[in-house]
Amino acid sequence: MKKKKIFIGTIISCVMLALSACGSSDNVVTSKVGNVTEKELSKELRQQYGESTLYQMMLSKALLDKYKVSDEEAKKKVEEAKDKMGENFKSTLEQLGLKNEDELKEKMKPEIAFEKAIKATVTDKDVKNNYKPEMKVSHILVKDEKTAKEIKEKVNNGEDFAALANQYSEDTGSKEQGGEISGFAPGQTVKEFEEAAYKLDAGQVSDPVKTTYGYHIIKVTDKKELKPFDEVKDKIRKDIEQQRLQDTTGKWKQQVVNDLLKDADIKVNNKEFKDTFKFLEKK
């Protein structure tokens, strides 16, 4: 089974289903070099896009069955799209083959439901595990342990950490800022790095820490006092939700897809599409 995309454009899906319902021999195109009938076009579309379309349709049904989306929620998303696109909004609707905003609202409902599904993966345990003090963290990343130890020795001898980061660090995203990691928070770095960082107090520098990226010398430049859990739990939850919505690995999106489609108890009755949901059996 080919790897599935989470959401695929719906316009070809609509065209394909409309044509397949016709099954007509009427010509869609006539030319000197040959004609194309509705039946031929329908067959071609089914072969190329049928599996993806069926997958998307079932995913949308599963999402909207479990996560209800109101017209008001969809309308809000449409208004956000209008503000973002400005004068291009109307032409974009036309390019998508949509007649009006109401049709766009319906198309957006599964995606809104998907956002709700991703957010629902955040548990109370996740929130508790991310209950940690706010910190500002800098680091110097190098490939080998020998170099890391040499740099740590320079830090111990009083050399400026930021200057050393600018000179030696191989993390191009932070070296120009003296090694400072923008927006450091739980769950945003690899486990070894995070555990080492949270053991440090403000002003402390770690020994070399090995991760899959290399060796890090970590410095905590600021560490806030931990606020009461009840004061920050909502913010922690929202932060985790945003992390998962923006996760580029696709881990949380795929987890949602697998769980929803498994629970849907899908049975494919058409041999042409018998392998569409085979990937669920391997999970």
Curated annotation (Swiss-Prot):
<keyword id="KW-0732">Signal</keyword>
<dbReference type="InterPro" id="IPR000297">
    <property type="entry name" value="PPIase_PpiC"/>
</dbReference>
<keyword id="KW-0472">Membrane</keyword>
<feature type="lipid moiety-binding region" description="S-diacylglycerol cysteine">
    <location>
        <position position="22"/>
    </location>
</feature>
<dbReference type="Pfam" id="PF13616">
    <property type="entry name" value="Rotamase_3"/>
</dbReference>
<feature type="domain" description="PpiC">
    <location>
        <begin position="132"/>
        <end position="222"/>
    </location>
</feature>
<feature type="lipid moiety-binding region" description="N-palmitoyl cysteine">
    <location>
        <position position="22"/>
    </location>
</feature>
<keyword id="KW-1003">Cell membrane</keyword>
<dbReference type="InterPro" id="IPR023059">
    <property type="entry name" value="Foldase_PrsA"/>
</dbReference>
<keyword id="KW-0697">Rotamase</keyword>
<comment type="function">
    <text>Plays a major role in protein secretion by helping the post-translocational extracellular folding of several secreted proteins.</text>
</comment>
<dbReference type="InterPro" id="IPR023058">
    <property type="entry name" value="PPIase_PpiC_CS"/>
</dbReference>
<keyword id="KW-0564">Palmitate</keyword>
<keyword id="KW-0413">Isomerase</keyword>
<dbReference type="InterPro" id="IPR050245">
    <property type="entry name" value="PrsA_foldase"/>
</dbReference>
<protein>
    <recommendedName>
        <fullName>Foldase protein PrsA 3</fullName>
        <ecNumber>5.2.1.8</ecNumber>
    </recommendedName>
</protein>
<dbReference type="InterPro" id="IPR027304">
    <property type="entry name" value="Trigger_fact/SurA_dom_sf"/>
</dbReference>
<comment type="similarity">
    <text>Belongs to the PrsA family.</text>
</comment>
<dbReference type="InterPro" id="IPR046357">
    <property type="entry name" value="PPIase_dom_sf"/>
</dbReference>
<feature type="signal peptide">
    <location>
        <begin position="1"/>
        <end position="21"/>
    </location>
</feature>
<dbReference type="GO" id="GO:0006457">
    <property type="term" value="P:protein folding"/>
</dbReference>
<dbReference type="GO" id="GO:0003755">
    <property type="term" value="F:peptidyl-prolyl cis-trans isomerase activity"/>
</dbReference>
<keyword id="KW-0449">Lipoprotein</keyword>
<dbReference type="GO" id="GO:0005886">
    <property type="term" value="C:plasma membrane"/>
</dbReference>
